[in-house]
Amino acid sequence: ISIVTETRNFHAIGVRLGRHDATITLFDLSSKVLAEEHYPLPERTQQTLEHALLNAIAQFIDSYQRKLRELIAISVILPGLVDPDSGKIHYMPHIQVENWGLVEALEERFKVTCFVGHDIRSLALAEHYFGASQDCEDSILVRVHRGTGAGIISNGRIFIGRNGNVGEIGHIQVEPLGERCHCGNFGCLETIAANAAIEQRVLNLLKQGYQSRVPLDDCTIKTICKAANKGDSLASEVIEYVGRHLGKTIAIAINLFNPQKIVIAGEITEADKVLLPAIESCINTQALKAFRTNLPVVRSELDHRSAIGAFALVKRAMLNGILLQHLLEN
């Protein structure tokens, strides 16, 4: 029996919960964006954050009531340690949480099926469904942002293991004598390949007198990438330096998982013509030849869509029958 999902009459809300804000997006079941809003969430306790988040979602629903037909799911993605089965959050990098039962709170408030997931792992799944890795079953996505993390897709599914969290690639040690990481160890990849670390490295070099197109008062990842694209030697050298360390770590992951494709995400990919060759150079010298041959390293196609990872969790629930059963019953 062939079943085709009716995409127009059913809607889902995807939420990307960041450290200081939330992006809330209304999707139809084809992944088309119908509406999107950004809400500041400066709260610093679990209780106040939950209250503010649920109110923001309620406000969003009220604002777009005319566009909503039947809301069948709400999905939230966020940084931290998430148990997708229980719907509980055990750790977030910016506030203290303790067994935060977010799914339970969402379902109690909105009376629909709800999901919660890790932001980077969910983005990897979204790339598999809608983006750069649609053409393969095994892929690794690495995202550079405030930190560095990975999402592993194996046989078309998120690889998470019994404990529910894998892919903390940012805490592989790449420089034993390097800077102290917020995790307590020294020389983690994240101390080199994260936006703040990249900006600080360029800023330090500028203060030492090195010449660059990057202005001292606007030393951001955006201006660094723009300068690298224009051939600025300092910006290019820093991006290459980051790329080499990413490449070393990705080579380890390749030797472990033998993926069909590597996807790189984050603002740093704006300098992809400098970054990707540096990554590939390390892969070519440090990954097994049989594993690296014909292995594409590409940019994310969905990095600009904040909440698409949240919708990927809804798509997965459609495919595995959880939401499909709901649709058939209605």
What are these regions (language model features)?
Residues 2, 12-16, 71-75, 139-143, ...:
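Short glycine-aspartate micro-motif
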Residues 28, 84, 153:
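Short, acidic, Ser/Thr-enriched surface-loop or helix-capping motifs
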Residues 33-138, 274-285:
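Glycine-rich phosphate-binding loop and adjoining helix at the ATP-binding site
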Residues 77, 117, 143, 265, ...:
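Solvent-exposed beta-strand sheet faces enriched in polar/charged residues
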Residues 79-82, 146-147, 268:
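Short glycine-rich anion-binding loops that position phosphate/pyrophosphate groups of nucleotides
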